[in-house]
Amino acid sequence: MPETLSKELIELKETCNTFARDTLLNLPEDPDSRETARNESKRLGLFMMTQPKQFGGTEATQLELTVARETLCSHNAPHVDSVFGPSPGVLGGVGEPLKSTHLSPLLNGEKRSSFGFTEPDDAPKPTSGKIEGETLVVNGQKSYVTGGADADFINALVHIEDLGPSMVVVDTDLDGVNIDKKFSSLDGSHHAAFSFKNVNIPSSNIIGEPGKGLPRAMRQIGDTRLLFAAQACGYMIWVINFLTEHLKSEDRSGEPRGNKDVVRWHYSNA
C-alpha cells in the first residue's frame, strides 16, 4: 500500500487491524469458526467491499481493497479468506438470464464459481466451442482451475468458431465435464484440472459479447494479481515483525540476538 494514506484509508486500516487482533487471532483454525469471522466482517462493513452496489455492496476501489488485504495479512491471522464476500469477477454487468441463474446466487453465497483460463502445455488446440442452434458445444481442457473441485460453475475462456475467444459459464454438473486431477499450491489453495467432451451449454451462457472474452479475462487476472500482491506484502510484514521481535530477545549469554554483527547483516539482507 502507499506510504501516504487519506484519512478514510487510515480509518479502514485501523478497522482491519482491530478486527484481526480482536476477532480473527482469537478464532481456532476450524471450519466452524468461518461463520463467526464472516458475521463480524459483515458488521464492520468489510464483507461487502468486493460486491457491487446494486447487490448491497460498497464496491470498494482497488486501493481500498489493497489496504484492507495487506493489513489483515500482516497479522497472519486465520480465516482471512472468509472476510470478503464473493465478487462478480467476469460476471460483472451481465444481463439476464445469467444475472439470475449465476451472478445473484454467487453474490448471495448460494453458488461457488471458478476461473478457467490456463490450458495444458500439450493441448492439441485451445478449448473450443461451436454454436449449434441455441446450444454451444464445448471441447477442450483447463489445467489450472483454482477452487474448481468445489465450484458449481467455471467461467472459462472458450474459442468459439467464427466468433473468437469468449468467456462462457460452464456448469460443473453437466455431462461431459470431468475433473481429471486435484492438487494444491504452497499458499494452501486448491485447484483442479478439467476436461470438456461435447459439453452442451445454452448459448445464453456466453458472458458479454462473443469474441470479446480475452479483455474481460485479463481484467480478472489483473485484479487477482493485485489481491495476491497485497496479501504477499502483508505476510512479509508479519515475517519481518516476527523476526524483529525474535532478535530483540536474549540468547543464552543474556544479550539480545540482534547485537551480533553477523545476525544484523542477515537481517539487513532480509
What are these regions (language model features)?
Residues E59-T71, A123-P126, S195, I201:
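Structural signature of FAD isoalloxazine-binding scaffolds in flavoprotein oxidoreductases
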Residues E3-K7, L12, I179-A270:
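Glycine-rich beta->alpha junctions and the first turn(s) of the following alpha-helix
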Residues V94-E110:
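A generic, well-ordered mixed alpha/beta core segment in the N-terminal half of proteins
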Residues M1-S82, T101, P105:
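Amphipathic, small/basic residue-rich leader segments at the start of a protein or domain
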Residues H79-L98, D121-A123:
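N-terminal glycine-rich flavin-associated loop
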Residues T135, N139-N178:
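A short core secondary-structure module
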Residues A123-N139:
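Cytochrome P450 C-terminal beta-domain/meander region
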Residues G109-T118:
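A short, Trp-centered hydrophobic/proline-enriched beta-strand micro-motif
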